[in-house]
């Protein structure tokens, strides 16, 4: 791990320690005063300023107590951005949230943070209570306001894979993959192992999964060894957004692909069909 990458990794670990200590002041020290946004893309919670984010932490943190935690299980960092696998325990927001987060830094401070997670196992009552109404749901995740600062090797791999996904071209996608690639769809609870089986799986689903046909690339975060790309699904899914995490080998080939999005927003019959497509 390069020194600058290790430094960002350490900063994020310190952030989660402060958040899990329920310390509003220490948590906010990690954010730039002119931050762009902190957004939960699943619930449509948008905090577009330092003051707005500080206010929501001040509202919730005094009610948290052990064993409530927010922690990272994997961090794929570059020098100025990262993809974070993270968990919010049920004591925080009423259910276990397994999140992929895109995080951008400027001068060592967080300027943009977007959480993506699948709500299908989350309590329906809480989901309906917390989710922003459709008419007010934010569609702009401010990716255009923050320049991509990901490693060139990651940008190359992410762009090639997303273009193949958008064209529903499984063979082109396979060209970017290591022979032992693992593909995970967190929303569909699907895992496929190996390039051969992954290619066959993609042939079956790229025309229908949100990250597939007609999807658009929005933003890339991470470093030489991995990160992720944010995307918007094609017109058939009403602007559903998601993220795909990537891990790379020394040659720039993709060794792991992990996608997440809110599958509660997909037609139930269509979701069942996609789940069934994991069977050869």
What are these regions (language model features)?
Residues 4, 55-153, 206-214, 218-280:
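A beta-strand edge to alpha-helix "cap/lid" segment located at domain peripheries
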Residues 21-80, 170-224:
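A solvent-exposed, acidic/Ser-Thr-rich amphipathic alpha-helical stretch
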């Amino acid at each position: 791990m390069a020194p600058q990458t290790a430094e960002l990794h350490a900063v994020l670990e310190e952030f989660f320690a402060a958040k899990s200590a329920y310390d509003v002041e220490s948590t906010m020290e990690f954010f730039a005063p002119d931050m762009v946004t902190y957004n939960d893309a699943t619930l449509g919670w948008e905090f577009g300023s330092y003051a707005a984010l500080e206010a929501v932490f001040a509202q919730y943190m005094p009610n948290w107590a052990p064993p409530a935690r927010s922690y990272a299980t994997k961090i794929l960092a570059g020098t100025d951005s990262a993809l974070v696998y993270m968990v919010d325990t049920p004591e925080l927001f009423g259910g276990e949230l397994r999140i992929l987060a895109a995080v951008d830094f400027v001068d060592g401070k967080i300027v943009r943070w977007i959480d993506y997670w699948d709500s299908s196992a989350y309590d329906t009552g809480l989901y309906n209570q917390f989710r922003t109404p459709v008419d007010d749901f934010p569609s702009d995740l401010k990716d255009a306001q923050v320049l991509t600062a990901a490693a060139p090797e990651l940008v190359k791999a992410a762009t090639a894979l997303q273009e193949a996904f958008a064209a529903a071209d499984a063979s082109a996608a396979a060209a970017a993959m290591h022979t032992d690639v693992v593909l995970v769809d967190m929303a569909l609870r699907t895992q496929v192992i190996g390039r051969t089986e992954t290619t066959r799986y993609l042939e079956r689903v790229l025309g229908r999964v949100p990250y597939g046909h007609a999807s658009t690339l929005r933003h890339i975060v991470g470093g030489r060894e991995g990160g992720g790309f944010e995307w918007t699904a094609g017109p058939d899914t009403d602007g559903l957004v998601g993220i795909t995490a990537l891990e790379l080998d020394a040659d720039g080939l993709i060794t792991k692909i992990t996608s997440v999005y809110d599958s509660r927003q997909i037609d139930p019959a269509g979701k069942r069909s996609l789940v069934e497509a994991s069977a050869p």
